[in-house]
Regions:
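N-terminal Rossmann-like NAD(P) cofactor-binding subdomain of oxidoreductases
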Residues: 1-145
Length: 145
């Protein structure tokens, strides 16, 4: 896989920080990282640590998604609903951790250990269920099969 431009929406929050850590630990081919957060984080001069560097946080706004290949969403529902469709319009594929798209019939709700193939039917946004749901489903999935 070639290096990707990856944006993390909500990069300064706890979930966003974990996403960054997972990207780094799994040696995901990030060519350029675009950490996005609120105006408050930008005004405070926040940075995120990634691959041994401090990367400045940019404002989460529609134009921030220009040239982005993948967006990992770790923002609140309202921010996700407002910005992820904008990212898709600009060509990104979004994996969202908020509640915003979980019940949307056009958005696959994916637990990779169970229904990873559903990713193929996405229209730009892929949702994941609540963490407690994932924890409950993974061990009982073999019983269902």
């Amino acid at each position: 896989m070639s290096d990707k431009t990856v944006a993390v929406l909500g990069a300064t929050g706890v979930v966003g920080q974990q996403m960054l850590q997972c990207l780094e630990e799994r040696d995901f081919p990030v060519g350029r990282l675009v950490p996005l957060a609120s105006q408050r984080s930008v005004d405070a001069g926040r940075t995120v640590s990634f691959a041994g560097e401090e990367v400045p946080v940019a404002l989460a706004a529609p134009d921030a998604f220009e040239g982005v290949d993948i967006v990992l969403g770790a923002a609140d529902d309202a921010t996700a609903r407002a910005l992820l469709p904008e990212a898709v319009r600009r060509g990104a594929v979004c994996v969202d951790n908020s509640h915003a798209f979980r019940m949307d019939a056009d958005v696959p709700l994916v637990v990779p250990e169970i229904n990873a193939a559903d990713i193929a039917s996405h229209h730009g946004i892929i949702a994941n269920p609540n963490c407690a749901t994932i924890i409950g489903l993974v061990p009982v999935w073999p019983l269902h099969q």
